[in-house]
Amino acid sequence: MPLLQPCNFQRPKYLFNGHLETIFPTLFRQVILPPTQQDLVETHDGDVLEVDWHRRGHPKLAIISHGLEGNSSRSYMLGMAKEALSKGFDVLAWNYRGCGEQLNRKAIFYHSGATYDLETIVRYAAPGYTEIALVGFSL
């Protein structure tokens, strides 16, 4: 696994604390991407997961998982998708159970310890890709 290099990030002076860094893009950031291909993925227990594909024919895939009470259409998800596309990845952004537009079929909602849905997504998306990167936001 490659090692990450130190980051020289310095926030703008007007975003002088972490709270503002979180709130500002939520209110003012707009990310424009072409329309996605939306699919429904059946789970092992008969529920359904919603996925948004951003396909450009790249050999690599980034699977992006949203944060607590987020979804695949949030600006931070779209921003990450845009960045991954620019780095040569196709993108699959998925919604945890109960976080998309579809109602759950089962009485099971998501929780951070339930990795079986992520495994379902990886198995669904993997064919045809030479490399898969998992990207996740804080729960």
Predicted regions and their residues:
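The serine-hydrolase catalytic nucleophile loop
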Residues: 70-82
